[in-house]
């Protein structure tokens, strides 16, 4: 089997309608991507699977859809206006700007220290490290650097007809703050007792200087976040619970265990508000990358908004007659990143008996863009085969493919990850049965048309 690389994944994604470069007819816009017909189905299935397990089937959690634009005081209280910065450094010869921490990490990873993290270093420490190690610009090959400066990652815009500081607002850099400011609304309206969680799926925006690796790091991205509120003193137990819950979700949807690892943050790596954080990392073709962060945020966010707004977010525990501000566990997952992980994990080039080969995307059926494809053996059979399509498409995403030979159609469906091909042949007119081919095993079984829906229902469960 050929080794996976990002170029192969990106090419397949474009060729088969998963992901296209953004604004391509105008030369594109750096690091923007549009999800094509199959990509939007895949990503929607990922979001649906997350919502199913984290909200629909959870007795603890409820959902929210907060506005992207928020009162700027939100970002003052959360610390994003003052602290949401990247350390930037420019090479004077190439005129290219880099994140200083990423320059250092890339250098150390190349030296063999795969787990080196520069998060805890001050600007002075990073500059001293770059100078002492003689780290050079990848483009110019020189070490002619500027001093390190802060660069705020928030996208700024204006509300109303005039562009003045009084009308200044921001595109949200995370979905979490919309949850925190609605904590009391949700808790009271839904009559929730601790522990409980508020989940949200939505777009966020960060003016990253060094985005890259396809849809792994982009300036516009989608998050699937849960803020889980609990009694202080129980947060480590719940952080462990959600860490394991998240890892199981990935495994149940087919992510290979050898391609994931759980990494606990060292004490000097923790954010100032966190007392425990675990990253679930995935082994992408370009290396290990963070997929999911599960952080114990303590009571930092609720207290910050209490102080800034004057509202009281404390909780009265009727069982113990205590009053306290809840602690919060945040499992935060990037929808685009995990979609990329599913693309990479599913991709396989398989050599078959007789020397033939095929490309197959082994998506879990719950995630596959199409659950099945209806393939009439002859175009003469298309009207009758279409009746099967119409019956199934009320409940499933189904493809209808009548062009080229049956073998080429099988290969095409394998390459887009369709789990089952349903062939309607001339015998189907007489016996009301179809042939169902399994994508992974390529085995075929004859089945009554009346049983196909129940068959697909069972197969897409996870």
From Swiss-Prot:
Top-level enzyme category: ligase
Q: Which residues bind ATP?
A: 206-208, 216-221, 290-291, 334-337
Q: What is this protein called?
A: Glycine--tRNA ligase
- PROSITE patterns noted in UniProt: AA_TRNA_LIGASE_II
Name the UniProt key words of this record, in alphabetical order. Answer: Aminoacyl-tRNA synthetase, ATP-binding, Cytoplasm, Ligase, Nucleotide-binding, Protein biosynthesis
Enumerate the residues binding substrate.
Answer: 99, 174, 221-225, 330-334
GO BP annotations, alphabetical order: glycyl-tRNA aminoacylation
Q: Would you say which domain of life the source belongs to?
A: Bacteria
The family annotation for this protein states: Belongs to the class-II aminoacyl-tRNA synthetase family.
User: Subcellular localization, per the record?
Assistant: Cytoplasm
Annotated EC: 6.1.1.14
| InterPro entries assigned to the protein according to its UniProt record, in alphabetical order | aa-tRNA-synt_IIb (IPR002314), aa-tRNA-synth_II (IPR006195), aa-tRNA-synth_II/BPL/LPL (IPR045864), Anticodon-bd (IPR004154), Anticodon-bd_dom_sf (IPR036621), Gly-tRNA_synthase/POLG2 (IPR027031), Gly_tRNA_ligase_bac (IPR022961), GlyRS-like_core (IPR033731)
**What's one GO MF term for it?**
transferase activity
**Self-association and partners:** Homodimer.
Record organism: Macrococcus caseolyticus (strain JCSC5402) (Macrococcoides caseolyticum)
Q: Which gene encodes it?
A: glyQS
The record lists the catalysed reaction(s) as: tRNA(Gly) + glycine + ATP = glycyl-tRNA(Gly) + AMP + diphosphate
Q: SUPFAM superfamilies attached here?
A: Class II aaRS ABD-related (SSF52954), Class II aaRS and biotin synthetases (SSF55681)
Cited HAMAP family: Gly_tRNA_synth_B
**Role according to the record:** Catalyzes the attachment of glycine to tRNA(Gly).
Taken from the UniProt entry, a GO cellular component term is: cytoplasm
Q: Which Pfam families match?
A: HGTP_anticodon (PF03129), tRNA-synt_2b (PF00587)
């Amino acid at each position: 089997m050929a080794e996976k690389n990002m170029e192969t994944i990106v090419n397949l994604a474009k060729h088969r309608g998963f992901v296209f470069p953004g604004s391509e007819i105008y030369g594109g816009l750096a690091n923007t991507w549009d999800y094509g017909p199959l990509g939007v189905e895949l990503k929607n299935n990922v979001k649906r699977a997350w919502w199913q397990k984290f909200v629909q089937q959870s007795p603890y959690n409820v959902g929210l859809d907060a506005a992207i634009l928020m009162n700027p005081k939100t970002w003052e209280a959360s610390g994003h206006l003052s602290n949401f910065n990247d350390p930037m450094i420019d090479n004077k010869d190439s005129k290219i700007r880099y994140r200083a921490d990423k320059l250092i990490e890339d250098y150390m990873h190349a030296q063999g220290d795969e787990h080196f993290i520069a998060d805890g270093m001050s600007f002075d420490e990073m500059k001293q490290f770059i100078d002492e190690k003689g780290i050079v610009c990848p483009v110019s090959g020189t070490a002619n650097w500027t001093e390190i400066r802060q660069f705020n990652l928030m996208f700024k815009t204006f509300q109303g007809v005039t562009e003045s500081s009084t009308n200044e607002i921001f595109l949200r850099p995370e979905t979490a703050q919309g949850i925190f400011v609605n904590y009391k609304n949700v808790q009271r309206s839904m009559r929730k007792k601790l522990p409980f969680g508020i989940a949200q799926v939505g777009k966020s925006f960060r003016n990253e200087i060094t985005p890259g690796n396809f849809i792994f790091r982009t300036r516009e991205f989608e998050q699937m976040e849960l803020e889980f509120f609990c009694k202080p003193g129980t947060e480590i137990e719940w952080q462990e619970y959600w860490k394991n819950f998240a890892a199981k979700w990935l495994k149940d949807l087919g992510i290979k265990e050898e391609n994931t690892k759980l990494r606990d943050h060292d004490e000097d790596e923790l954010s100032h508000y966190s007392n425990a954080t675990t990253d679930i990392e995935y082994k992408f073709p370009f290396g290990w990358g963070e997929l999911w962060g599960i952080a114990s945020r303590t009571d930092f966010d609720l207290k910050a908004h209490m102080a800034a707004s004057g509202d009281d977010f404390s909780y009265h525990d009727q069982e113990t007659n205590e009053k306290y501000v809840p602690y919060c566990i945040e499992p935060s997952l990037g929808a685009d990143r995990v979609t990329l992980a599913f693309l990479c994990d599913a991709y396989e080039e398989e050599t078959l008996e007789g020397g033939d080969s095929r490309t197959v995307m082994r998506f879990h059926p719950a995630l596959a863009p199409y659950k099945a494809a209806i393939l009439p053996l002859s175009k003469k059979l298309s009207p009758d085969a279409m009746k099967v399509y119409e019956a199934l498409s009320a409940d499933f995403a189904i493809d209808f493919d009548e062009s080229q030979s049956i073998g080429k159609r099988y290969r095409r469906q394998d390459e887009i990850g369709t789990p089952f091909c349903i062939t309607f042949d001339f015998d189907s007119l007489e016996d009301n049965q179809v042939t169902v081919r399994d994508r992974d095993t390529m085995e075929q079984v004859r089945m009554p048309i009346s049983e196909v829906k129940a068959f697909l229902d069972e197969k897409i469960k996870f």
